[in-house]
Every structure is written in C-alpha cells, then in structure tokens.
C-alpha cells in the first residue's frame, strides 16, 4: 500500500511538528492520561564533538518539522513537544540518553540520532523498550545486521550503494576512457567507510587499481601525511569517505601539494552550504552522493523548501531533509494507526504498519526491507559553474557530468 497525502495537513504537516521543550518527568507521559495533551518525542543528537556539524543540521530539520506541524493542527490533533539531548558524539552517552528519554522522561516516541556510530547503540535501547526507531543518518551495513526489527532508515539508500549511479556512469565509458588508479581515504566510521568502499568495490571490479587505502580516526585534523601519500600516488581518482571538517581539511591539504585528480568524490561535506567557503571556493567538479535536493519534484518537497527557507534564510540541505523525512515517516504511521504512546501494543502497530506500507516523503517514496534498509538510490551531485547540481542519473540531471575535474 502506498500512502500519499496531498492536502496541506498531510504527511508534510505531520512531519514538522516539534517544539523544543521539556518532556514529562515520570515514567509514563502525561499525554497518555487524557489523550489530548502534547505528544512528546525524545531525541539525542551530537551537538558537540566529532559529528556536531551534521548533528546541528539534523536538529534544525527536526525543529522545523516540529514548528510546521504544530502550526498546522498537530499530530492526531495534538501538539508535539521535542526533547533534544546532546550525546557529545559519544556512543555510550547516546545509549544513556535514550534510556533517560524513555525510562525517566516518559516520552511517547523517539527519533534517531546522526551517524551509524550513534544509531546502533541508540536503536538497541529503543528495541529493548519495544519502541519504533526511525533514524535519519545510520546508513552503514552494520546497522541492518544487528537484528533490529524496529528500525527504519529515512533516506533513499544505504551507504554501500550511495555511489551506484556514478559507478554505472564510469562503467559505461569506453575502457580507454575510464580512470586507471584510485586513492581512498575514509574516516574510521561505518557510514563514511561504507560510502567510500562501496565505490571502491565497483571500481576494482572494472579494473581500476587501488593505489592508496587509508583509514583515519574521527578526530584527525592534520591530513598532511595522508595527502602526501595520495599526491605521490598521482591517482586518477580520489574518494573521501568523509563527514564534514575532515573533508575540508583533506582537500586543503591536497591542494597545498598541488595534487590534481581527474575525479574527486567526497561524502556528506560537499552538500553542506558552508562547504564552498570552507575550502576557498575551489569546488568545480567535486562530486558527492546525496539523498536529497531542494529541486526534487516529490510531493510536499516544494512546500518544505519554501517553509524551511522562509524560517531559516537558507534552503534545506540533506541533513535537514533527512530529519524532516524521519518526522514524515513516523507521522504517517501514527496517523494511520491512530496512536502515539509508549505502550508496547501501540509501538508494535506503528512498526508493523511501516513494514507493509510505502510513504511519500521529501526525499521520494520510501519502503523498507525486513531489516530497515530503504529500497531506493542516491542522486549524484557535482559542482558545475560554482553551484552544486544533480548530474546523475541522467533523467534527473540538472547539468552534464564533468568527467575530468578542472584544477583546484
């Protein structure tokens, strides 16, 4: 069954209804007592530490979702309240945060954090309490091999598949025109490594030789030695399994060594609005997979972009959109089932409904396999004439793919 809500108070509205306030202090939300109080939603996010930049983007998306829904009639006719805790990018902290949100604060629902590293322990806590767990940013394969029957990833594709359209385009080239060598540098993070190594697998299958393969700790700031290895290799392609600041620092280091790859692809960072300024505006030709673009012609996306841009002054990026999508997915289930409380029966009904249905969202129609993997694909974006544009697949392209990156 496919769920499409076209009226204003539809999935979009239902997916934007959180006000940043406190939750209840008892083990059971007071909203359960009379059925017309606020629905409380608990979230832990990395607002400080290694993942703080994208974590704040997810926070902005959740808060915008909250405001919109509350301005448009609420969820099940009730306002929602959002409680956000800072997990400091720490896996132990995120687990204790969700324990507190569920067991002490008595939230009715939970939304997931940012990054695979934090999603896995958070999802385990949610599973232990029987809670539905929809998350915006845990895309690595290890998320889906833990036996989480309560988890749904609110984006189009898992990390290993993010570069599939780019790999297809390279494979379609005459063999003489394909790159011959590639260098890989990935953060020691399941998502970041998944994106880079998913493309690595495809390129190696085509005969592209791996000449550098580096994994670095999440707190790495000095990329001098890694950049030197890549520059010395003269690799045709550089693939960065990155989040944000690591990509910026890596690119700056590579430019300082005058390394000029024919193709450069980095995960996450290039879709961030601050990225061009951070690397000195030398962006032309840089590639990145994305699960979202403001220009996408999906139901409710234009309204989302208009609302978010008016509220924040800038269009939404991928992190904000995935957070909004998380709200849309949960809201669709809540409205369909007719409940939003921590009772195990209600939570199981929400889980079961999402297992059987497709939901239209701002990132496209989403459906999931039994482990919570979305059954879609990521777009490929590239900086063309100073703007980041969709270049793959061809049917969605806003600009032609630049096969050989200009010097940076």
Feature locations, PLM:
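Extracytosolic ligand-binding ectodomains
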Residues: 2-6, 14, 24-408
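C-terminal motif of bacterial Sec signal peptides marking the signal peptidase cleavage site
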Residues: 19-22
């Amino acid at each position: 069954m496919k769920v499409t809500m076209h009226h204003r108070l539809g999935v979009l509205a239902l997916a934007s209804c959180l006000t940043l306030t406190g939750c209840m202090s008892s083990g059971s939300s007071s909203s359960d007592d009379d059925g017309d109080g606020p629905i409380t939603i608990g979230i832990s996010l990395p607002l400080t530490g290694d993942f703080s930049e994208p974590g704040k983007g997810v926070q902005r998306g959740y808060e915008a979702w909250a405001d919109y829904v509350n301005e448009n009639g609420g969820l099940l006719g009730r306002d929602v309240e959002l409680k956000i805790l800072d997990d400091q990018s720490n896996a132990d902290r995120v687990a204790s945060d969700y324990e507190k949100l569920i067991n002490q604060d008595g939230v009715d629902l939970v939304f997931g954090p940012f990054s695979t590293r934090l999603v896995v322990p958070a999802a385990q806590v949610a599973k232990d309490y029987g809670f539905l767990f929809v998350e915006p940013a845990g895309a690595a394969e290890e998320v889906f091999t833990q036996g989480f029957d309560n988890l749904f990833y609110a984006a189009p594709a898992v990390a290993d598949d993010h570069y599939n359209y780019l790999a297809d385009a390279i494979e379609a080239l005459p063999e003489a025109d394909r790159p011959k060598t590639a260098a890989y540098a990935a953060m020691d993070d399941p998502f970041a490594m998944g994106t880079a190594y998913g493309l690595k697998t495809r390129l190696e299958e085509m005969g592209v030789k791996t000449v550098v393969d580096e994994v670095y700790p999440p707190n790495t700031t000095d990329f001098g030695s890694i950049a030197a290895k890549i520059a010395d290799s003269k690799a045709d392609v550089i693939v960065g399994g990155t989040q944000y600041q690591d990509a910026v620092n890596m690119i700056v280091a590579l430019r300082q060594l005058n390394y000029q790859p024919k193709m450069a692809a980095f995960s996450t960072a290039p879709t961030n609005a601050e990225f061009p300024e951070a690397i000195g505006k030398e962006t032309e030709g840089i590639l990145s997979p994305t699960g979202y673009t403001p220009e996408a012609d999906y139901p409710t996306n234009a309204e989302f972009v208009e609302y978010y841009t008016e509220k924040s002054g800038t269009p939404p990026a991928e992190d904000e959109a995935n957070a909004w999508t998380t709200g849309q997915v949960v809201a669709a289930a809540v409205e369909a089932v007719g409940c939003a409380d921590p009772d195990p029966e209600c939570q199981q009904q929400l889980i079961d409904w999402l297992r059987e249905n497709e939901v239209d969202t701002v990132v496209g129609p989403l459906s999931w396999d039994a482990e919570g993997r979305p059954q879609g694909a990521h777009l490929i974006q590239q900086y063309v004439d100073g703007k980041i544009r969709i270049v793959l697949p061809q049917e969605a392209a806003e600009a032609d793919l630049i096969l050989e990156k200009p010097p940076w």
